[in-house]
Design a protein with these regions (language model features):
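Short, flexible micro-motifs
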Residues: 36, 42-43, 147
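N-terminal strand-loop-strand
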Residues: 1-37
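Unchanged
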Residues: 27, 40-138, 142, 152-163
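Short hydrophobic-aromatic micro-motifs
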Residues: 20, 141-144
Length: 163
């Protein structure tokens, strides 16, 4: 698998919810104020699953031992095609207490996957201005790469529930 990054789509419940983080709005970063799945660059010696689990721990205090990995459900392009990102689908093994664990994240929470099934519309992002996406509860804005990935996750989860 030719990828350089990985994200963890940690899903639970009925209706299905997925864990997201918001990249801190108080730092000067390309990703500032973006809603994202926990994830990042693959380090030497890691595979996509190991990367996704490490990043979930680093960004949201979700310990790898509390996660059941269901598999890699696809690869998506990000950063205008410069990154190839593996999407790792998982579910919690039991109760977890996710919360921001680094200065790069200022929010961790669960969003209902039903929020991404409609048609995207123009919404105002705190840093980027008007983008095509979804306004989520709490004033979060979902758009771009994470929106595409969560639409794939929602379709995959729906198919698995119907099987």
């Amino acid at each position: 698998m030719d990828v350089d990054s990985a994200v963890l789509a940690l899903v639970w419940g009925d209706p299905a919810r997925v864990l997201v983080v918001r990249k801190s709005c108080s730092v000067d970063s390309y990703w500032a104020c973006d809603v994202a799945l926990p994830g990042g660059s693959i380090e030497v010696g890691e595979d996509p699953v190991a990367t996704a689990l490490r990043e979930a721990w680093e960004e949201s205090y979700v310990h790898p031992s509390m996660v059941e990995v269901l598999g890699v459900i696809g690869v998506e392009s990000a950063a205008k095609g410069l990154r190839r990102v593996a999407v790792v689908l998982a579910r919690p093994k039991g109760p977890i207490d996710p919360r921001p664990s680094s200065s790069e994240v200022d929010f961790v929470g669960w969003i209902n996957l039903d929020h991404v099934l409609g048609e995207p519309r123009e919404v105002r992002h705190p840093r980027r201005g008007v983008v095509l996406g979804f306004e989520l509860p709490g004033g979060l804005v979902l758009w771009g790469f994470t929106m595409r990935v969560l639409r794939r996750v929602a379709s995959t989860v729906k198919l698995r529930l119907e099987a």
